[in-house]
């Protein structure tokens, strides 16, 4: 089970976007990287095709998972993630900072 998944709200711990938060769009577990909406934006030069015009577009670049932390559901501050079994016997994620369950 992954600590950071698609749809999670995360906080950037280091880098040019330190302190910013956003939603995870995609996770690459093999590369230990994630794409976060609005974080680590880079400009790419787009060649003209039949469907798209030429120009410079901004898109998200991947961020290493070690530079991300889940945002605590209670107050939005960065927290570590723990795992425990719920009453149904399913493994669930929880925020170690507040003890709140993390959706997903």
From Swiss-Prot:
Q: Which GO terms describe its biological process?
A: translation
A Gene Ontology cellular-component term? ribosome
Q: SUPFAM superfamilies from the xrefs?
A: Translation proteins SH3-like domain
Coiled-coil region: none
Q: Name one Pfam family in it.
A: KOW
Q: What keywords would UniProt list here?
A: Ribonucleoprotein, Ribosomal protein, RNA-binding, rRNA-binding
What the entry lists under InterPro entries is as follows:
KOW, Rib_uL2_dom2, Ribosomal_uL24, Ribosomal_uL24_CS, Ribosomal_uL24_KOW, Translation_prot_SH3-like_sf
GO molecular-function term, one example from the UniProt record:
rRNA binding
Please indicate if the UniProt record lists Protease as a keyword: no
Top-level taxon of origin: Bacteria
The record ties this protein, via PANTHER family, to: MITOCHONDRIAL RIBOSOMAL PROTEIN L24 (PTHR12903)
Family to which the UniProt record says this protein belongs: Belongs to the universal ribosomal protein uL24 family.
Query: Could you give the subunit structure recorded for this chain?
Result: Part of the 50S ribosomal subunit.
Q: What does this protein do?
A: One of two assembly initiator proteins, it binds directly to the 5'-end of the 23S rRNA, where it nucleates assembly of the 50S subunit.
The name under which this protein is listed is: Large ribosomal subunit protein uL24
Q: Which organism is it from?
A: Bartonella tribocorum (strain CIP 105476 / IBS 506)
At the highest ranks, the source species' classification is:
Bacteria, Pseudomonadati, Pseudomonadota, Alphaproteobacteria, Hyphomicrobiales
